[in-house]
């Protein structure tokens, strides 16, 4: 029988006083992922959005979603890591701590690139908030330079709230005796920093996280071949189809989900089910439970990342 850990979480609710309730979180006994958020950089709902897709969330707050982010947990060593630091960092860190013992911050943060939904959460590690001590932040060369030479991020470095850990494209970073991470540079709008996805290794098993890329065809590598080699794949699904937003979509290039499904249509079912679409714009119908788009994706054998879900290697 497999050993399970149970952590009792004390949730405090404030309303003219204090009340509390206990929740039980079941923790696998081998490394796993926690989906900490699924929305595009601006979150869901998005600022100034008056469309039904957003107004529905004000009537029913349970429909809201945090910005795309995944957590990796090793229950054997009681360690955790985050991939990206979003504007929802505070809530996501707390969610991740449910799966480790007596730790309030992750053991490391891997940044993919310098767009607002992917690194700005580290501000909560600074003096105005937690005033953390030497939290490891893994960053590529341009990202390290950007954080070191531009305020307010440079203050996090100079006051040692964070310690920048250098990583290089295609170079493996060993985290412990079970887990390692390899950054993979991908084409994207690199105004300030380069953009990477991450391959996560656990023994002979591998996962891939690419929340942002311009188009699969612009990458000199084959995403189809990568999928065949992986056990879990989290992929950019910002927009479901062309024309989804009322602007020139070439200004914000991403692979449309319709394009990705067509590209992946010849994969065998076992490979298709490895794929979790993530990083949804507020206009993306994959955010709507039971939508035609959701049913279409699932009928083709693909998966949709769900916030707070636990995914085993």
Kindly give the residue locations of the regions a language model identified.
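Active-site metal-binding motif and surrounding structural segment of the metallo-beta-lactamase
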Residues: 66, 73-138
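C-terminal motif of bacterial Sec signal peptides marking the signal peptidase cleavage site
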Residues: 15-17
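Sec-dependent signal peptide recognition
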Residues: 2-9
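Residues at the starts of beta-strands that form the adenosine-phosphate
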Residues: 32, 79, 134-136, 231, ...
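Cap/insert and terminal regions of metallo-dependent hydrolase folds
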Residues: 204-206, 213-309
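Core dinuclear metal-dependent hydrolase active-site scaffold
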Residues: 23-98, 164-226, 310-313
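A short, active-site helix/loop in glycosyltransferases that binds the activated sugar's phosphate group
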Residues: 142-151
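Active-site neighborhood of phospho(di)ester-bond hydrolases with catalytic His/Asp-centered motifs
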Residues: 82-86, 105-118, 122, 138-140, ...
């Amino acid at each position: 029988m497999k050993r399970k850990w149970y952590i009792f979480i004390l949730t405090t609710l404030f309303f003219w006083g204090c009340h509390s309730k206990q929740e039980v979180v079941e923790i696998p006994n081998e490394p796993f992922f926690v989906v900490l958020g699924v929305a595009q950089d601006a979150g869901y709902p998005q600022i100034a959005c008056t469309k039904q897709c957003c107004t529905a969330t004000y009537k029913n707050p349970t429909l809201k979603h945090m910005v795309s982010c995944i957590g990796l947990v090793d229950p054997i060593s009681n360690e955790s890591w985050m991939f990206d630091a979003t504007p929802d960092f505070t809530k996501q860190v707390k969610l991740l701590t449910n799966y480790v013992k007596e730790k309030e911050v992750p053991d490391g943060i891997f940044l993919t690139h310098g767009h607002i939904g992917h690194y700005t959460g580290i501000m909560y590690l600074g003096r105005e908030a937690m005033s953390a001590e030497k939290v490891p932040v893994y960053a590529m060369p341009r990202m390290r330079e950007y954080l070191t030479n531009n305020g307010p991020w440079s203050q996090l470095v100079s006051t040692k709230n964070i310690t920048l850990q250098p990583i290089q494209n295609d170079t493996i970073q060993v985290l412990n005796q079970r887990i390692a991470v390899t950054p993979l540079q991908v084409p994207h709008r690199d105004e300030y920093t380069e953009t990477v996805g991450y391959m996560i290794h656990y023994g002979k098993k591998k996962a891939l996280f690419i929340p942002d890329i311009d188009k699969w065809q612009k990458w000199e590598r084959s995403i189809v071949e990568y999928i065949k080699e992986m056990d879990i794949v989290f992929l950019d699904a910002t927009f479901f189809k062309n024309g989804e937003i009322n602007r020139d979509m070439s200004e914000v290039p991403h692979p449309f989900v319709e394009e990705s499904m067509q590209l992946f249509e010849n994969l065998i079912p076992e490979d298709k089910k490895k794929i979790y679409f993530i990083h949804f714009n507020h206009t993306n119908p994959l955010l709507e439970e039971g939508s035609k788009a959701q049913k279409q994706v699932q009928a083709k054998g693909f998966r949709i990342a769900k916030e707070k879900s636990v995914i085993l290697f």
